[in-house]
Each structure stands twice: as C-alpha cells, then as structure tokens.
Swiss-Prot record:
CDD domains to which the protein is assigned, alphabetical: Peptidase_C19J
Enzyme active site: 707 (nucleophile), 1153 (proton acceptor)
Domain USP: 698-1202
Record family assignment: Belongs to the peptidase C19 family.
Described purpose of this protein according to its UniProt entry: Has an ATP-independent isopeptidase activity, cleaving at the C-terminus of the ubiquitin moiety in natural or engineered linear fusion proteins, irrespective of their size or the presence of an N-terminal extension to ubiquitin.
Name of this chain's protein: Ubiquitin carboxyl-terminal hydrolase 2
Keywords: Hydrolase, Protease, Thiol protease, Ubl conjugation pathway
Cysteine pairings via disulfide bonds: none
PANTHER family (alphabetical): UBIQUITIN CARBOXYL-TERMINAL HYDROLASE, UBIQUITIN CARBOXYL-TERMINAL HYDROLASE 2-RELATED
Length: 1220
C-alpha cells in the first residue's frame, strides 16, 4: 500500500520548461561543478526524499528535540533520526526538557535571517538559537554553578525555505519531513547552510529533515554547553574571593572588603561577548580591552580571552613615544554570512552569551532567595527574558501552531507522528506514508491507527479502519494471550484455524461476560490474520451472553412459542433490514437456550452462512456417527434417542455444539434415507408413525366423551409402583384382602367399606389391570378402555353395580361400538352439546374384543362385567363432567385402596397402603388463641392435593401456595379469636396441586373460567411450607408474611388511586376534568361567584401532583418489595420436587377439551402430549406456555420427589405380543 500524495499546484508551460531544463542541467553536472551554477529556486533538489525513512511532522520534531536530552544522557544518542517505533513507548514516560529562547533581540540576537547565496531573492535561511533546560534542576547555592553543564544543552535550528516552491508546490495539510543524511546534502544547500563538523566535540546531535513537497530544509543541532564544570568552578565563591584578593595586591584601587558577587563576575563575562557581537560593520571601531583593566583582572580569568574567546593580545599603540602596555582585541565577527569560519565563532559567542545570561539570572535569583546583603545590579541579566513558548518554532517553519493535547505523547500517536487535533485526512495520510516506507511494521502502525481512531471517535477514521485488511501487532499478541499462547514462542501464521475454534468453543460458554468479549475479539483478530472465514463467521454470529437481550431485540416475551419467535424475527427483518445480523444472533441465542431444532432450521433457511459452515456433506458418515457417539448398526429410533439425549442434556461445549449435532444427524438421515430422522430434523418432533410401536407409549381411544379420564389413566400408568401393583393384582390379592387381620376394622376415607363397594373396587382394579396390560402388550398405537372401567371410574361409590359373566361383557362392548343404545336419542349428539371432547373423534372408534388376562399372556382371573345400559353410562359421564379432576382421582384411588390389602391401620383405623404412601401427605393445623398463645390446639389432616386459587392473582406457583399456607385470624364460637396456621408435617412421594380456575359470576349467574397465567417451574421447593422449629426459617417465614402484607396494602392503595368511577374516570382524571371546568368560564357565564376559582385550581394542581408523586412512590416500593420477596428462601432448597405431569383444559367453564403432558425422565427428559389416542412429543416451551389469553390452561400439576424420578415414574412400558 503506497502513501497517498497531495497533488502539487499546476505550473504553467513556461514554469514547467524552466524546471525541466534546470533539472536536466543539474543531472548532467558533477558535484564539483555546482559552484558555477546558481539555484533557480524552482527545482526540487531532493526529488526522491519522499522515499526516505523515517519521516516526521514539525510537531513530532519539536517533541523529539525536547526529549532528546534524556536519551542522550541515558543512551548516548538522540532520537531525532530514529523511527518513532524505537522510542515511542519510552517517550510517554518522560518529562520533556524546557525549550527556552530569548525574547529581546536588541542586546543579544539569538535569531538570524539572511538570503541564500545560491538563490538570492527566492530562498532564505533562518537560524535560531535556544536552550534545552532540565525542568528538575534548581541550584541551591552559588557553589552549584559548576553543575549547570549537566542540566542544559544549546539548540540551533536552521531552516532553509524555498519561496517559489512554497507558493506553487506546497501540499495541503500537515507537511512531512524526511530524514536526510548529511552526506546527501545538496551542494547548493552546503553553500548556504553552516553545519558544525561531526568531529566537533561540542556537537552531540545533528539531524537534517527535508519536506517532500517543497524541499524545505530543517537542520537541528544539539550542542554541549560552552563552559564545562571546570570553567564554571572559577565562579564558585572561594575562587571569586581568591581571584579578587590577588587583584587587590596588584591594584591599589580595589577595596579588599568589596568582593564582587557571582552575578557581577558573570556580568563582566557577558560584556566581553556582547561588544564583538554588536559590532555592525567592518568600518566600526573595535572595542579594545586593556590588559590592566581592574574589573577584568579581578572578576575573570584573563587567560580565557585568548585561549577560549579568540581574542588577540597586542601591544598598545605608541602615542608621544609612550607605550602604555598591552590590550585584548576581540575577533572580527562582521562577515559571518559568507565566511563560515567567522560564522562558527559568532555562533559560539552567541551560545556563550545565552549561557552566561541563563546562569547570571539564576545567580541573581539566589541572591534574593538566600537573602544576601549585597544585591547585584545587572541590567544585562534582568532585562533579558527567556520564554518557553514554542510559537517561534511554528513561525520559523511557517506552519500553523496546534495546541498540544494529552493524547499527543501516547506512543500510538507518536508512532504515526500525529497530534490529537490533526484532521482525519492528515492522520490517514501519515498512516499511509508510514506503511509505504516501513512495510515490515505495518501491524504496529495499524495498532496506532486503531488507537487514534478510538481516541478521537471519528466516523471517518472508523470507516477507514474497517476497510483495512490488516491485523494490528498488539491485537495479534493480545489475541494469542487470550488463547493461552505466548507470542514470543509461536509463529502465529502457522496456527490451525480448527484448533483455535475448538479452544474458543470450549471456553466461551463458561466464561464471564468480559471474558466472552475478549474471546470474541481474539477470535476475530486471529480469523482475520489467518484468513479464516469460519472464524469470522463464528464471531459475527456469536450468541448474546444474556438470552433476555435476544428476546428484547426481537420484541417478544420469553414465554411465547417458537412459531411466534419466527414471526417476530421475520417482521423485524422486514422493518429493519440493516439489523438482520443482530436478529440472526438473537434467534440463534434463543434457539440455543431452548435447544430448538425448529428455530435452528429457521436460522439455516434465512442465514445461508450457517448451512455453509455446518453442511452435512463436509463430514463423513463415520464422523457423523462419532459425533453422536452411536454404533453404525443402531436402528434409526435408537440413533434418534441418543441424539435427543445429547441434544437435551449434553453439556453445551460451545455455541456450535447443537449445530454439529444437527449436522451429524443430517448426514446420517441423508445417508440412510431415514424418514424418521429427516422428519425430526424438519420439525423437531418425533413422527410417532415412523417409530416402532414398541418404542412409544400407547394412546387411549375416546369411547364417547370420557372427559379427563383418559389423561388420568395415562397418568396412573406412568407411576411405576402403582402400575406394578395393578398389573400384579389377581384373585390371590382379593383373597388376601379378605384374610387380612385388618379387613373388618379398616376405614377408607374415614368410613367403613361395604362388601358391595369391595366387590366393585376389585372389579375396577381388574378392568384397570387389563387396560394397562393392553397398553403394554398391544401391537397397535392405541387401546380402548372397557365401558365398565369408564363407568366405575366416574360412578360415585354409593352407586351399586350389578355384575355378570364375561360373555355378557363382550356383547355389551360390541353394542357400545355400534352406538346401539336403549334410549332412541342420539347419545353422541347429546354428548357433543355438553363437551368438545366428542368432536375430537372423527368416526366411531372400533373397540377391541375384551381380552382376559390369559389372552394377554398372564393367568386368567375372575373378571366380571358390569351390567350397564347406555343411559347409565351417559348419566355417569354427566356426573364426571360435573366433577373436578380431584374428585375423579379420589374416586379411582379410593377403589384402589378398597381393593388393597391394608399394610397397617392408623390410630383412627384409617388404612395405610401403597396409595397412601404415594399420594397422601399430612397437614398440621394449629389454632392459637389470640389472648392465650400457650393454649395451642393442633390437628392433623391427610391431603391428597393442595388447592391454589387464581382468583387471588398470584404471580407464580409459590405466590399461590403462600396464599394457601398464610395465617388466618378467625372468630370461633368455641375458642373466640384465634390465629390459624397451616403447615405440612408429612409430604407424599407424589405431590399434586390443583389449580382452581372455575368461579361463579354472581352478576351473570353463571360459572366462568379464569385463564390467568400461573407460572411454575420444573422444580418446586417445599421447605417454607413445612412444620419446622428452625428459628432461621421461621424468621424468614414471618418476614415474608409481613412483607406480603405490606405489599398487599401498597397494591390496594395503588388500585384505589387507579380505580375508575361509574363514568370511567380515575381520581386524577376527575380532578383534571374539574380543573378544565373551572378554567372554562362556565361559572362566570352563569353569574356564579368565581372569586375563589384561582385558589381552587391551585389546590387541584397540588392534589394532582400529590397523586403523581404517590403513584410513583408506590410503583417503586412495590417493585422493590417484589424483588425482595422473590429472593427470599434462597437458602432453603432442601426439599425439592420435580414436575412430571401437567393436566390441561382448553375451553370455557362449561365445555372444553382435556389432555395431559407427561415428562419422561428416562428418555432425555422429553415431554409427551397424551391427547386420547394421540401420543406425541412436544417441546418444553409448549408445556411452560404462560401467554396471556391462552385458553389452554394447566389445572392440575403433579410433582415427584427429587431423586425418586427414575424409580417412581416410567411413562414408557411396552412388551409387544408375538404376531402369529
């Protein structure tokens, strides 16, 4: 990449010809013959200087001058000619020396301007003398004078300007000055510029810079002090006194007590230099100094005049034949322009003079600071002022003075030779020049450009950086370190992209937010450096750290289904196409969080890069099997099962973990042409029709309108201990029941059991056993319950049932399938009017022949058939519709208990059995008299389920349970005012929670269903509801109750302020309307006294403001309280339950449809939807759908104790019958 150059101003034809002719002549001449030529001032003497490295700007040169003393003293060399990369880092740690110059040019000139000798009239030379002074040096007394040489340097700046080229060839913007070696100096410039010889011991640094556009030349020379420490020691106090005493012996005029001060001695020294410098012309008379001068002999070392100052000692002229003695004659410094030897002496005199002024002024300051009695009067010092302003530098170069900025000394700014206040165009120009001249270090310059860009925040620079295909040196090293690599030990160009990606994936998801940012930036840098598009792709589409950010970006709630997210994604892209990549990242984030194949498919379709980099054809079949970790001989359903396990529960090793799994399964599905696998990949749902029957639970046909019974039967089937008990029930079980020692005394539900109930219950278990056997052994995808089972499940326990033999049962079953009923009314149509369930059956379901247990592969038992008419069945179903699910569960479980042999009896003779162990817990209720808290009356009650209400508007399941277990204050006739506390003393293995959703509308005189969402999670902790003596937990419970009461009071006040009156106005709205009325002038129009209207309006404004402030305060307090409450009990999570069944009702209070979701912990935690004869897999998001307005609402939740999931819950149990 070459540096861009500003175009030169156009020359006219005559000018171009002149420049060309001169250039040709110059090229044809030897260097020795240049003395015969005259520079026309129109030709670039250094046409190739732009290729010289390094280059610097005038600001950089100035700063280099000021920091060079540090480098000279520490390393013995200057930085003037060095590339900035070599010293920029050290520079930012240094304090530059002060660059001072003399303001007054009358008594002592420190600047000279004269015409060029080779091109007079067009080219000019300026010379400026200044001092570099250590800012940290301050003499403490007069004897510190000999330390001065260590703390300052002389600076000489020579600038040659070529006015013609300045006018016609100068580029716009910051000028670039390139280093020129002294031996390359053009002969024309050698004749014009006096350069100290390198062998001169006083010269410590000499640098030449030439501008590329106009060949303006800058000569920088840093020179040692003219007086060394030994010289200045002559002006220590003791030396001054010694010299003065010696002079007193020689000159009687001197007063031995009037010893001159250090400043007086320096003043005399200054006057020696001043006179030769002020001589104007060769005709001017020399100011001779007598060798017998009292001041000279008493204040300085007279030998210096001839040995150091180029004076000559001569005899005094003879007058009247009398020779008075000897005198010192100063050197002739007039012809300094043409005579370089004279110029050298004159410049030395100028440096000596400035040096003496600097030291003399310090000496006079010390007189004041030390309070000496004698104060020196020396106008040559007091009238001379040094300035630290750098304006002269920019004036002499004819450049704009740019005020410095703190960023300017940052090494990145230094490396580009830019200042913070440079315009973007100049910064880019400097960068391009640097990389053109120093390609090897382009990465360093790009680092610098990026830093400058970030510091300035310039859009133009940001855009420019973005277009550069360069990786910065620091960026690369930082990236390597993020990846655990030592930049000094590794060649980054040899890195393997896949290895870097593996590292990135393995660390990303377990890193903090800041670490993720570092990883992402590092991968981007390495991807760019290695040219890996896949690495850059991973960076661009990295999922958001917080999934909530993705939901917010797509403007959806986290509870919505995948198809809603797809819709939101599509709409957002249509509205803002420029943000598509952000929306891609958002849907990718959500897909990973939900582990949703559907959303990943959407992303793959909409973002081809995902399909490009995770294409199933990029891996082999064997590699695909290895990714899923499955044997090649495994069947499709086994492969899918293993895949689902890894998909749902595998450790997310990186953001592409699921993409790799999906890619592997796609390869297998494509290779095997598997309908099952390919359907799953397309939908994310297992197509049950493609599965072997033995790998999926059987559905249950709807034989009429069995409401929620099918869901209950599936639910009971999944509970392994209960299912095993039912499957193993036989005549021996019934006989054991009769023989039990507890049989005659036992009670079920607190009452005695009749023989008829017992017979009925045994038959119910037989029929349930046969259904469960069918569900296990059938070769079909669904089974049909007998009408006896349906009838007995719904019929109340007090309804007597007549049983016949098995032959009758088969006939009755067949009659039921053909819809032949005793009542001529169409029962099917009647049922459909009551419940939507019947609509789910598209045609009459063919019921299977009733099989005895022997036909199912087990021993035949005494199964009897209930004699049930169609009317009886319909009436029983109507009873079932009027029951809630818990009544049916109670009826079914009661029959199971009645048919069970008692394990033991409670004190109240209540039977203890498997059902009690699985489903029943125990509630402890304490009645505490308000006036006598010691007299606690405790009562224990069994519970089958806990009832929570949506009418209380709980925000989640915990909030609902809190209402159930909250303390109540009652007035009882027997005890008076009491506090009732409720807690759990014993929990069941299977915890059931009923959600009350049906309420009665007293205005419409009809029931209605509440569809208010009640969020719940997969885990429920019951610690806070247990009967406990733990003081910490009790204190937390008490605080929780107090906070909730406070929250309730705040919300009640909020509702009151926001409530509307009969015309729909809130209190604030009413006040506003009142104010408008008062302001309308209606009262005045009707001659009603309105004197107090202004005060009334003012008062209304106060009320309105008070309402606003109170509502704001209420909102903040409610928010804070809800946050505090939600974080309570975080330490009490020892008694956990896992959700495994969710019963759903869709519809209204008087009609609807039922199904159940059941989780299979043994099959990767998948959720299945049991919808009568259909059993399908569903995404977890469908189960936990708490969308407002959703009429498919959970009404019954079932949890199992944590740690007992595998042993208690087994949804899939299939052993197929052998086909003949």
């Amino acid at each position: 990449m070459m540096a861009s150059q500003e175009p030169a101003l156009e020359l006219n034809g005559e000018q171009r010809d002149s420049v060309s002719e001169t250039a040709e002549v110059l090229r044809s001449k030897s260097l020795e013959s240049f003395s015969d030529l005259v520079d026309d001032g129109k030709t670039l003497l250094y046409g190739d200087i732009s290729k010289s490295f390094p280059f610097k700007t005038c600001d950089r040169i100035l700063d280099d001058i000021r920091i060079s003393p540090w480098f000279l003293k520490k390393f013995g060399s200057s930085v003037m000619k060095q590339p900035m990369l070599q010293y920029s880092r050290e520079r930012q740690q240094l304090q530059p020396w002060n660059l001072v110059h003399l303001i007054d040019q009358v008594n002592l000139r420190s600047r000279y301007d004269y015409d060029s000798m080779t091109c007079p009239g067009k080219n000019t030379i300026s010379v400026m003398f200044a001092l570099l002074v250590d800012p940290n040096f301050t003499p403490n007394d007069f004897d510190d004078i000999d330390k001065f040489p260590e703390y300052f340097f002389h600076l000489k700046i020579t600038v040659k300007r070529r006015s013609y080229l300045e006018n016609f060839n100068r580029h716009v913007g910051i000028t670039h000055y390139h280093v020129l070696e002294p031996e390359s100096l053009h002969p024309f410039d050698k004749r014009d510029i006096f350069i100290m010889e390198e062998k001169d011991c006083r010269l410590v640094d000499q640098s030449i810079f030439v501008s590329a556009d106009t060949n303006k030349l800058i000569l920088v020379e840093i020179i040692k002090p003219e007086f060394n420490s030994e010289n200045l020691a002559e002006y220590r106090t003791a030396k001054i006194e010694e010299r003065y005493k010696n002079a007193c012996q020689e000159f009687d005029l001197l007063n031995p007590d009037d010893i001159p001060s250090q400043a007086e001695c320096l003043k005399t020294l200054f006057m020696i230099f001043k006179n030769p410098l002020q001589r104007k012309s060769a005709n001017s008379e020399f100011k001779i100094i007598s060798r017998d001068s009292v001041a000279l002999n008493s204040q300085i070392n007279t030998d210096w005049l001839t040995t150091m100052f180029d004076f000559s000692l001569q005899k005094t002229a003879v007058e009247d034949n009398v020779q008075s003695g000897e005198e010192y004659k100063p050197p002739d410094l007039v012809d300094y322009i043409t005579d370089f030897k004279v110029r050298g002496i004159r410049e030395a005199y100028t440096r000596k003079s400035m040096e003496v002024v600097l030291i003399g002024k310090q000496s006079m300051l010390l007189e004041n600071e030390l309070g000496t009695e004698k104060k020196t009067v020396a106008k040559c010092f007091s009238n001379q002022h040094f300035s630290a302003s750098h304006t002269w530098w920019f004036n002499i170069l004819n450049h704009q003075h740019i005020e410095p900025f703190p960023y300017d000394i940052n090494y990145h700014f230094i490396n580009l030779s830019v200042a913070f206040k440079y315009i973007d165009k100049d910064i880019i120009k400097n960068y391009e020049t640097q990389i053109a001249l120093d390609q090897e270090n382009i990465s360093h310059y790009f680092d610098a450009l990026q830093y400058v860009t970030n510091a300035k925040g310039s859009y133009q620079l940001i855009a420019y950086c973005g277009k550069q295909d360069v990786v910065g040196y620091e960026d690369l090293n930082n990236a390597l370190q993020v990846f655990g690599l030592d930049p000094t030990d590794i060649d980054a160009s040899l890195l393997d992209a896949n290895t870097m990606i593996e590292y990135y994936n393995s660390h990303l998801l377990r890193s903090s937010d800041n670490q993720r940012k570092d990883l992402r930036n590092a991968l981007r840098v390495l991807g760019k450096y290695l040219g890996s598009q896949k690495m850059l792709f991973l960076v661009e589409y990295e999922p958001y750290y917080n999934v909530q950010q993705a939901y917010t970006l797509l403007k959806v709630d986290e509870t919505v289904d995948d198809d809603i997210i797809q819709t939101a994604y599509t709409i957002n892209i249509a509205d803002a196409p420029g943000l598509k990549k952000d929306y891609d990242r958002a849907i990718f984030t959500i897909a990973l969080d939900r582990r949703s194949i559907f959303l990943l498919n959407v992303l793959t379709d909409e973002c081809p890069e995902f399909a490009q980099y995770y294409n199933c054809t990029d891996i082999s079949y064997d590699e695909a099997l290895n990714i899923i970790e499955i044997d090649m001989n495994a069947s499709d359903d086994v492969i899918l099962e293993v895949f689902q396990k890894k998909w749902s529960h595998g450790i997310m090793t990186g953001p592409d973990y699921l993409l790799k799994l999906k890619m592997a399964l796609q390869n297998i599905g494509f290779t095997r042409n598997s309908k099952l696998i390919n359907h799953f990949l397309d939908t994310g749902i297992v197509d049950v029709s493609c599965l072997p029957v033995a790998t999926w639970p059987a559905g249950i046909n709807n034989v009429g309108n069995t409401c929620y019974l099918n869901s209950l039967l599936q639910f009971f089937f999944t509970i392994k201990p209960l299912r095993d008990f039912i499957l193993n029930y036989d005549d021996d079980s019934a006989k054991l029941l009769d023989a039990s020692e507890y049989h005659s005394r036992r009670r079920i539900g607190g009452r005695e059991v009749s023989k008829q109930e017992e017979l009925r219950s045994v038959q119910f278990v037989y029929h349930l056993r046969d259904l469960f056997n069918d569900m296990i052994h059938t070769n079909s995808r669904c089974v049909t319950p007998t009408k006896e089972l349906v009838y007995l499940a719904f019929a109340p326990s007090n309804v007597e049932v007549e049983f016949g033999d098995d032959t009758v049962a088969q006939k009755e079953l067949i009659d039921l399938t053909t819809d032949v009923v005793e009542d001529p009314t169409d029962t099917t149509r009647h049922l459909a009017s009551c419940d939507d369930d019947i609509i789910m059956c598209q045609s009459p379901v063919a019921l299977p022949e009733h099989k005895t247990s022997s036909e199912a592969g087990t021993q035949q038992y005494s199964v009897q058939v209930a004699k049930i008419s169609a009317d009886q069945l319909e009436n029983t179903l109507e009873i079932g519709r009027q029951q809630d699910v818990t009544e049916c569960i109670g009826n079914v479980l009661a029959q199971l208990e009645i048919a069970s042999e008692p394990l033991s009896l409670e004190d109240d003779l209540e039977q203890n059995d498997l059902v009690k162990q699985l489903f029943y817990g125990r509630i402890k209720q304490d009645l505490i008299p308000v006036n006598d808290e010691a007299s606690v009356r405790t009562k224990y009650e069994r519970f089958l389920s806990l009832l929570v209400n949506t009418g209380d508007h709980p925000k989640d399941i915990y909030d609902a349970l809190d209402f159930y277990f909250q303390n109540d204050y009652l007035n009882l006739e027997e005890y008076g005012d009491v506090k009732r506390t409720v807690s759990i003393s014993e929990l069941p293995a299977v915890l059931q929670i009923q959600i009350q959703r049906v309420y009665y509308d007293r205005e419409k005189f009809m029931p209605f269903k509440s569809i208010e969402p009640l969020p719940f999670g997969e885990t429920l902790y019951m610690d806070r509801y247990m009967a406990t003596e733990d003081p910490k937990l009790l204190a937390e419970i008490q605080q929780n109750a107090e906070l909730k009461q406070k929250l309730q009071d705040l919300k009640q006040r909020q509702r009151k302020l926001l409530s509307q009156n009969e015309i729909g106005l809130t209190l604030k709205s009413s006040l506003i309307e009142t104010k408008k009325f008062l302001q309308s002038g209606t009262l005045k129009a009707h001659d009603i006294d309105a004197d107090n209207i202004p005060s009334s309006i003012a008062y209304i404004d106060i009320l309105i403001n008070n309402i606003d402030e109170e509502l704001k305060s209420l909102f903040n307090k409610i928010t804070d309280l809800e946050t505090t409450i939600s974080q309570q009990f975080s330490e009490f999570k020892h008694i956990g339950y896992s959700l495994f069944a969710v019963f759903i009702h869709r519809g209204e209070a008087s009609y609807g449809h039922y199904w159940v979701y059941i989780k299979d912990h043994t099959k990767n935690g998948i959720w299945r939807k049991y919808n009568d004869d259909s059993v399908t897999e569903v995404p977890q998001s469908e189960v936990f759908n708490f969308t407002e307005g959703n009429t498919a609402t959970p009404y019954f939740l079932v949890y199992v104790r944590e740690g007992q999931e595998q042993e208690t819950i087994e949804p899939l149990k299939r052993i197929l019958q052998q086909q003949e």
